[in-house]
Curated annotation (Swiss-Prot):
Involved in biosynthesis of legionaminic acid (5,7-diamino-3,5,7,9-tetradeoxy-D-glycero-D-galacto-non-2-ulosonic acid)(Leg), a sialic acid-like derivative that is incorporated into virulence-associated cell surface glycoconjugates such as lipopolysaccharide (LPS) which could be a key determinant in the ability of L.pneumophila to inhibit the fusion of phagosomes with lysosomes. LPS contains a majority alpha2,4-linked homomer of legionaminic acid. Catalyzes the conversion of N,N'-diacetyllegionaminic acid (Leg5Ac7Ac) and CTP into CMP-N,N'-diacetyllegionaminic acid (CMP-Leg5Ac7Ac). GO terms for biological process: lipopolysaccharide biosynthetic process. It is an enzyme of class 2 (transferase). CDD domains: CMP-NeuAc_Synthase (cd02513). SUPFAM superfamilies: Nucleotide-diphospho-sugar transferases (SSF53448). Coiled coil: none annotated. This is CMP-N,N'-diacetyllegionaminic acid synthase. It holds the Pfam family CTP_transf_3. It comes from the Bacteria. Belongs to the CMP-NeuNAc synthase family. The keyword Ion transport does not apply.
């Protein structure tokens, strides 16, 4: 199976400017994902999709390829990463280069391990379905309230039904670390999700970290200082 790994790294982060090249444990943030992808030995090609020459140079330095810089229309705040992935697939196809599947690795999950990537790929190969990483979430609907039009705190009936559901079924959240789907599925449905989609359960809090704000960054550095986690 020929797998294309795509690491999206847009330059224009507003909540944490310059995060993709900011140093974490002595390496740019994006480098940790590139190294993990390389060490997984799962991918035919590892491509960083970016609109930034600086990010591109860092990506190449750590072993990824940047065959094209991302166009402006795919690098806005409202751009969906799926359109970037489809654009890459079409560009490779124009060069007579074809991939069976695409593995999406967000650079904001620096604790993601190579073996976790291999596990996701194995599930995908065995089932033929899309695989998306998720984490357990502790949701207590009994603690949830909304505010009505008069400004009063109320407990909607919806939350009561949700409480019954949560008591009987574990709830998981998407953590953004790993997505994998066939190229055919992505192009036809413009989505990484298939019917059904298989979960990759990440019980590790650190592997589920998604750095998006200065607080996220500070917590990540604190984890490292406490020697509770090691980066690749």
């Amino acid at each position: 199976m020929r797998i294309l790994a795509v690491i999206p790294a847009r330059a224009g982060s507003k909540r944490l400017p310059g995060k993709n090249t900011r140093l974490l444990a002595g390496k740019p943030l994006i480098a940790h994902t590139i190294v993990a992808a390389l060490q997984s030995s799962c991918c035919e090609e590892i491509v960083v999709s970016t609109d930034s020459k600086q990010i591109a140079d860092v990506a190449v330095q750590y072993g990824a390829s940047v065959p094209w810089l991302r166009s402006e229309d795919l690098a806005t705040d409202t751009s969906d990463v799926i359109h970037t992935v489809i654009d890459l697939l079409f560009k490779f196809q124009q060069m007579d280069v074809f991939f069976d599947s695409v593995l999406l690795l967000q650079p904001t999950s620096p604790f993601r391990k190579p073996e976790t990537i291999r596990h996701a790929v194995e599930i995908h190969k065995v089932t033929g379905k899309s695989v998306v990483s998720v984490s357990p979430i502790s949701l207590k609907p009994s603690w949830c309230r909304s505010i009505d039009s008069q400004g009063n705190l109320v407990k909607p009936e919806l939350f009561q039904d949700l409480e019954i559901y949560c008591n009987e079924n574990p709830i998981y959240k998407l953590n953004g670390s790993i997505y994998i789907a066939t190229a055919k599925q992505i192009i036809e449905n413009k989505s990484f999700y298939s019917e059904p989609t298989k979960p990759l359960l990440l019980n590790s809090i650190s592997e589920s970290i998604d750095i998006d704000t200065p607080i996220d960054w500070a917590l990540t550095e604190k984890l490292m200082e406490l020697n509770q986690e090691a980066l690749v």
